[in-house]
UniProtKB/Swiss-Prot annotation:
Protein name according to UniProt: ATP-dependent Clp protease ATP-binding subunit ClpX
Annotated residues for binding of ATP: P121, T122, G123, C124, G125, K126, T127, L128
Taxon lineage: Bacteria, Pseudomonadati, Pseudomonadota, Alphaproteobacteria, Maricaulales
MF GO annotations: ATP binding; ATP hydrolysis activity; ATP-dependent protein folding chaperone; protein dimerization activity; unfolded protein binding; zinc ion binding
Keywords: ATP-binding, Chaperone, Metal-binding, Nucleotide-binding, Zinc
Length: 423
């Protein structure tokens, strides 16, 4: 903006800051924008305000730490069941925030972090728990897949790429990234391939476990901002992983057999104690897991030692699967109902249909992950024909439709022409 005073020709061309009103002669620099100006002093003031806000978001006051109950309640909105695992995660995240506050107080006592291991059968909600945490946390969060990792120097992702993803989630703010949370999925896939030494290196198994040790415990990792080894001339960023919380999860297929065999002893001979095969559900058996079982499964002792908190997830029964289909905010039934609403058609699932879908998912042993593929198979033909159908008001799916013995019921709206003729 410009001002004029008393017809003075010099004042006609004088520019002023649109925020503080100082003239261009009173400040060092005046930056022009579309019809507005801002001086260097106002820019510095804005930067100071932003820095203070960043500090307050990085290190919250004690009253601002989300309580475990608050985190638990939010997880309940999206994840059905798994109360024990949700409590473990809620406490861990709450303590993570407290550790950040404690570190800022320069106390003599250093609080060590407690990395978490989630164990549960496929489709029970491990990944969904991590994804839901990402929605509610006020710290940078990233997910990684252990199956893509290899030792440094081999084709594949380096372990440092995990830190790079966290850095990207923090918009390359190193200070924020150093207080983030990392979730590594499919951690059971990097178990040692065999107990016998081999002349070939296990670059995607034990080698990855060895590489993960340091960043999980705490080290200064050199991270290439552009990733990979394609830009050897780039400057590396130094990220301290001491305050990064690591949550790792896996299905650990076969671990239940390792646990069941523990302590059974020999069953050979006349006086042997012959036992029946363990008939318990997988989730019940996994609840008894001990570090020695993980060692026999193929994790190295050093890696298990850096995961002091172990949470096991339960198998999902019919009731839980029906709840998953209907209750969460992003439930599958609600998603398909929304798709049908876009065509102006309602969609209804009867109670026996929901139970039949849950039974099929249990039979497939895919947990909640198999629900979507079952729903797609049931509704495929209906979704194909729906845009070309006229007058359909509602589609009803019952148990016979799920079992393949009938087609979905189409309810047609009464036409206005028919109503007029009747009148």
């Amino acid at each position: 903006m410009s001002k004029t005073t008393g017809g003075d020709s010099e004042s006609k061309n004088t520019l002023y800051c649109s925020f503080c009103g100082k003239s261009q002669h009173e400040v060092r620099k005046l930056i022009a924008g579309p019809t507005v100006f801002i001086c260097d002093e106002c820019v510095e003031l804005c930067m100071d305000i932003i820095r203070e806000e960043n500090k307050s978001s990085l290190v919250k006051s004690k009253e601002g730490v989300p309580s475990p109950q608050e985190i638990f309640n939010v997880l309940n909105d999206y994840v059905i069941g798994q109360a024990h695992a949700k409590r473990v995660l809620a406490v861990a995240v709450h303590n993570h925030y407290k550790r950040l506050n404690h570190a800022s107080q320069n106390s003599d006592v250093e609080l060590a972090k407690s990395n978490i291991l989630l164990i549960g059968p496929t489709g029970c909600g491990k990944t969904l728990l991590a994804q839901t945490l990402a929605r509610i946390l006020d710290v940078p969060f990233t997910m990684a897949d252990a199956t893509t990792l290899t030792e440094a120097g081999y084709v594949g992702e380096d372990v440092e790429n995990i830190v790079l993803k966290l850095l990207q989630a923090a918009d390359y703010n190193v200070e924020r990234a150093q207080r983030g949370i990392v979730y590594i999925d499919e951690i059971d896939k990097i178990s040692r391939k065999s107990d016998n030494p081999s002349i070939t290196r296990d670059v995607s198994g034990e080698g990855v476990q060895q590489a993960l040790l340091k960043i999980m415990e705490g080290t200064v990792a050199s991270v290439p901002p552009q990733g990979g080894r394609k830009h050897p001339q780039q400057e590396f960023l130094q990220v301290d992983t001491t305050n990064i919380l690591f949550v790792v999860g896996g299905a650990f297929a076969g671990l239940d057999k390792v646990i069941s065999q523990r302590g059974q002893g020999s069953s050979i001979g006349f006086g042997a104690d012959v036992r029946e095969p363990d008939a318990r559900r997988t989730g019940e058996i996994l609840r008894e897991v001990e570090p020695d079982d993980l060692l026999r499964f193929g994790l190295i002792p050093e890696f298990v030692g850096r995961l002091p908190v172990i949470a096991t997830l339960e198998d999902l029964d019919i009731g839980a699967l029906v709840q998953i289909l209907t209750e969460p905010k992003n439930a599958l039934v609600k998603q398909y109902q929304r798709l049908f609403e876009m065509e102006g058609v309602g969609l209804t699932f009867t109670e026996d249909a929901l139970k039949a879908i849950a039974n099929r998912a249990i039979a497939r042993k895919t947990g909640a992950r198999g629900l979507r593929s079952i729903m797609e198979g049931i509704l495929l033909e209906t979704m194909f024909d729906l845009p070309s159908l006229e007058g359909v008001e509602e589609i009803v799916v019952n148990g016979e439709v799920v079992d393949g013995n009938a087609k979905p019921l189409s309810i047609y709206a009464e036409r206005k022409d028919d109503k007029r003729e009747g009148a």
